[in-house]
């Protein structure tokens, strides 16, 4: 799993030039340039051209550039790959992945293009079959990350989502477990009510607590709340620093554990503390460079 934060991952319609321009100034960690759901069938080819032109212009800074292509069993999937190779995106996101073989097929196709030699593959986890095959998909050596497609999944499962997402927790947790076992990134699904800040904050915190690395977003107004939810808080940073110091002092005195705030601190807690500090430092560096 990469140490690079993916707190906020914003969907942008791939064929809308005005949105592509605005995205250059949005403080999101990553952008999904969408050629699938956000583009009508009659506009697929023109959207592809528009996106490639804008990616070649650049200006997206250190934001990770992710292109969601159309499935390879559609009339546009292979054409998407051929076209975007020139723009050298960081990641290609494959929608509606059901089995690991689909990732392998994409990897073989991408290997034909010099511009995609360093491009990674992420999978949309948004079908019942895909969820059941999550461990196999996550273990695919070509795969670097997963993204939950909670809207499509809810539709296919015929479930109703409330504020707790209780009807989907088993699917979410299975994918987190598969991703962690494989050591890859995993991103939570979208929150549709983009004007409900309280609801967004609660769902972002829930996703963080479930183990997700970040959350996909449908509106720029959601970025700040989600960035804060998935970043270490000042309280967490302070605790991490004190745990590191206390354990070091305990070790120097021949002890295998320390006590901080009345709780035992072992080596595993210190490893987590170092990860918290490192993540905080990377986020600060990213934000400085992104805002330049």
Model region roles, listed by residue range:
Residues 1-292:
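Expand to "…catalyze enediolate/carbanion chemistry for C-C bond making/breaking, isomerization
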